[in-house]
């Protein structure tokens, strides 16, 4: 195997086969899949799509191990762009516009590339709209003078408030207070698909490398803190917490907080900025929430 490509909703497999006829196509990567791919002894790996949330995501260490083995690892479009932005200094090769946005800090949230998609039997068809596509559409609309700067920003912000599994163009456009003329002009645009564009570029670049005799440039591996060290420190902190007289109450509060956070994510809920600001202030002041609420009532 010269090239292994982890690909799902970003680009149809049929198109990837046309771009790189000899490539081995694999479904979106989950934790451990790059280690398994190394058994095929590829010259290059193109990491495009990957699983998250319900499945453990691709681990940084498996990418670093591939690089240490002399395998070129390219990343783009989705999970690949995220990991390439994080591991570019270690030798992973990022490709495309989304990678550039992440590398330069224009976007920071992993949720920007998240979407809901069908399974392999349905060709990993995208069922929702990633926020990066809305950003690209807003930029195009502003460039073509269809949207003003404020309207383009409002389009992105309103799309970001919709839970990623429920975000579609009809849902996003229903939130916009545009004139009929603006809607008609926006509807006439050929909306970009940066995920597909970046995936194509990544497959082509990885295929060119895999088919050449080029060697991977050697870069010093960044010394990441071992997971064993992190786990040992976590156990130490847990032992200190368990020795406290209120350990049971702390455990109950932590479990409740984790369950509520997971429930909120499943409903697509996110805290408002004023709530976040108050929480940050309480943390800096070292004041518990119930104490802050009692103080607010006393001052009212």
Annotated model-derived regions:
Residues 22-37:
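A short, well-structured beta->alpha microelement
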Residues 26-27, 46-47, 73-77:
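General beta-strand structural signal in soluble alpha/beta enzymes
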Residues 43-52:
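Short, basic, glycine/proline-bearing loop/turn elements
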Residues 58-71:
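Catalytic-core regions built around general acid/base machinery
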Residues 79-118:
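Class I SAM-dependent methyltransferase SAM-binding "motif I" and its flanking Rossmann-like core
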Residues 132-186:
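Charge-patterned, long linear interaction tracts outside catalytic cores
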Residues 172-246:
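Acidic catalytic cores of enzymes that act on phosphate-bearing nucleotides/polynucleotides
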Residues 234-300:
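Peptidyl-prolyl cis-trans isomerase
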């Amino acid at each position: 195997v010269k090239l292994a490509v982890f690909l799902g909703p970003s680009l149809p497999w049929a198109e990837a086969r046309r771009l790189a006829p000899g490539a081995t196509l694999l479904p979106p990567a989950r934790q451990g899949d790059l280690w398994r791919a190394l058994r095929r002894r590829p010259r290059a790996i193109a990491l495009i799509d990957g699983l998250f949330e319900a499945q453990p995501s691709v681990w940084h260490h498996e990418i670093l191990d591939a690089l240490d083995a002399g395998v070129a690892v390219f990343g783009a479009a989705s999970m690949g762009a995220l990991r390439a932005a994080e591991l570019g200094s270690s030798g992973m090769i990022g490709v495309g516009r989304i990678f550039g946005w992440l590398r330069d800090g224009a976007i920071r949230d992993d949720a920007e590339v998240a979407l809901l998609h069908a399974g392999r039997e349905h060709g990993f068809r995208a069922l929702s709209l990633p926020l990066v596509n809305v950003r690209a559409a807003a930029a195009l609309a502003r460039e073509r003078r269809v949207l003003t700067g404020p309207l383009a920003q409002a389009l992105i912000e309103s799309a970001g408030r919709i839970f990623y599994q429920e975000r579609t163009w009809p849902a996003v456009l229903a939130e916009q207070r545009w004139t009929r003329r603006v809607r008609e002009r926006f509807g006439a645009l050929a909306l970009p698909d940066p995920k597909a564009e970046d995936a194509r570029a990544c497959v082509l670049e990885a295929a060119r490398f895999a088919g050449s005799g080029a060697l991977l440039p050697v870069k010093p591996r960044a010394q990441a803190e071992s997971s064993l060290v992190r786990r040992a420190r976590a156990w130490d902190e847990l032992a200190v917490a368990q020795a406290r007289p209120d350990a049971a109450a702390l455990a109950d509060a932590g479990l409740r907080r984790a369950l509520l956070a997971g429930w909120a994510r499943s409903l697509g809920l996110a805290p408002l900025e004023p709530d976040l600001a108050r929480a940050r202030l309480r943390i800096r002041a070292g004041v518990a929430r119930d104490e802050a609420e009692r103080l607010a009532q006393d001052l009212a």
